[in-house]
Every structure is written in C-alpha cells, then in structure tokens.
Regions:
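Short beta-strand edge/turn micro-motifs at domain boundaries
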Residues: 93-124, 141-169
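Core segments of small alpha/beta cavity-forming domains
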Residues: 1-60
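Short structured motifs
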Residues: 59-63, 136-138
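Beta-strand elements of well-folded, non-transmembrane domains
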Residues: 79-85, 157
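Intrinsically disordered, low-complexity acidic Ser/Thr-rich regulatory segments
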Residues: 39, 44-54, 119-146
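Residue-level signal for tight coil/turn positions that link beta-strands
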Residues: 68-72, 159
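A short hydrophobic beta-strand element
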Residues: 71-81
Length: 169
C-alpha cells in the first residue's frame, strides 16, 4: 500500500479485499492526471502526492497475533489509518483552481496560445496550478482524521501463494 502499487497489491489480495478498501478507486482517480497531456510538472506533482497519501494511509502497524491452520492463516493487527472518506480527489477542485489561474494569468497564457498552440497553453496552465492544487490537497489529506485500526486479515494459500482473502475490522 505504501508504494501505491495496485498491481503488486492485486498479487497478494483478492478482488473482494481490494474493492472493499477503495484503494484502486483512489489510485484510478489520481492516475487520470498522469497522462502526457498534463505536462511533466503536473504529472510529477500528481505522482508525488499519490505516493504521499498512500504512504500515510496506514501507520504504526503491529502484528498482535497469528493463527495458522493448514492453508489458512489469520493475522490480527493494530495501528492507525487515515479516513479519506471525506477527501475528494475529483476534477472539481482542479477545474476551480485552473479557472482562477487562467483569470490571473490571461495575458501570459494568451501569448503562449498564440505562439505555441493549445497543447502548450494547457500544459502552461497545468504547470502553473500544480503547486497550488497539490498544496491545497495535501493540507486536506493531512487534516483527515486518523482512526485506530484493529483488523484481522485472513490469508489463504492458493497455487502456492498466500493471498489476503478477507479483512475484518
């Protein structure tokens, strides 16, 4: 989870577990902003932000108990988790920030559009708003409440690999 690598998570957790955690949804919402059309600065800021929120999602994790029974094992863990349920990563904040930026930098952006075209204009906007947008979003996610986590993970051996098949909180 800390690496924000859904592909790796899919190798160790069942689809039911992943869908219940909403990690894939969060990652997908943010990954839409890593396309080339957004420009290098915006993509880099998006990736940095994405890694930061996934890194802070679960902290102070401690294994409290392990019970093995053949091809099934349960692991009880405690720790802390951020509650991002009220934090939105949708396009509305992006649109609002972009609109404000365009209004404040009309002359400069008009020149870029005239001399370099629409694509350069859009990248200039994204480059300009990236620090503003991600600073605001960072403050929002850092202020998200931290909750105590107590969970029991169920792991099952399938095809010689241990897969997380359940999480009970």
């Amino acid at each position: 989870v800390k690496e924000c690598d859904i592909t790796k998570l899919k190798k160790v957790a069942s689809e039911d577990v992943l869908s219940g955690m909403d990690l894939e949804k969060m990652e997908k919402e943010l990954s839409q902003y890593t396309e080339e059309e957004y420009g290098k600065v915006f993509v880099d800021e998006t990736n940095k932000f994405k890694k930061a929120i996934f890194k802070d999602l679960f902290t102070d994790i401690k294994i409290k108990d392990i019970k093995a029974d053949g091809d099934k094992t349960t692991v009880k863990v405690t720790g802390k988790q951020k509650d991002y349920s009220q934090v939105s990563f949708d396009q509305s904040e992006l649109n609002t920030t972009a609109q404000q930026y365009v209004e404040e930098h009309q002359d400069e952006l008009a020149k870029v559009y005239k001399e370099e075209g629409l694509s350069a204009y859009q990248i200039k906007v994204y480059d300009g708003i990236a620090p503003i947008l991600y600073q605001s979003m960072t403050e929002t996610y850092k202020s998200a409440p931290t909750e105590k986590l107590t969970a029991t993970f169920t792991l099952e051996k399938k095809n010689d690999k241990w897969i997380i098949t359940g999480i009970d909180e």
